[in-house]
């Protein structure tokens, strides 16, 4: 029997053209592709027609598969000789639970390759005209998640003034609470802030305001998941650098 293996592939942020060369190579080798909600469906066409495709997407309040079931599927199919590609939006090791899946493989003795992807923590702001660092404006940035499995969130008040630019992934669900906590931790109420939804797709939208008014501005145009929050002086640069129209690919939902 041919030795199987697992390849954790970062799909990048929305646009299928932003996957890495190694990512496309891995898909071409696949016997099974286990893919997430935020990975562009167009990437599935890069796998052989004979390859099995299994949806394992997660979204607020529901999941197609439990994490334990995903881990077990990867290990089982690789042990049976398959090349299993685990396709994840962004980068698998940036709030993508890729580390858990890699550990499951390692503990089961299954070879596992990691193919990094372009993380939305940097790409979503960039695609909206916001650099996360900029000379003499922002020399540091931090990335946190706005959504956790058990409600044990990040202490944003403690982090508020520790970095120039703060990026919050999965930010839409608790946007008002996040902005309030950052203000409570010492960020200025009038500090520039932006939220970017569906980055890298034709449905990309962004709203720019301040920490004080961004929640209301976002609610007024029904910004929802998936969305990335950017807080810091660099957010104001979107007024000059944002593209006139989204440059990406439509993602069927």
Labelled PLM ranges:
Residues 1-16, 21-115, 214-215, 224-227:
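Class I S-adenosyl-L-methionine
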Residues 3-8, 79-84, 97, 140, ...:
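A contiguous loop/helix-start segment that scaffolds small-molecule binding in enzyme catalytic cores
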Residues 21-24, 42-44, 74, 131-133, ...:
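Short, flexible, glycine/charge-rich loop motifs used to bind or transfer phosphoryl groups or to couple energy/partner
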Residues 35, 88, 116, 145, ...:
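Short beta-strand/turn micro-motifs composed of small residues
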Residues 43-44, 105, 124-125, 178, ...:
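Hydrophobic packing residues within well-ordered alpha-helices of enzyme cores
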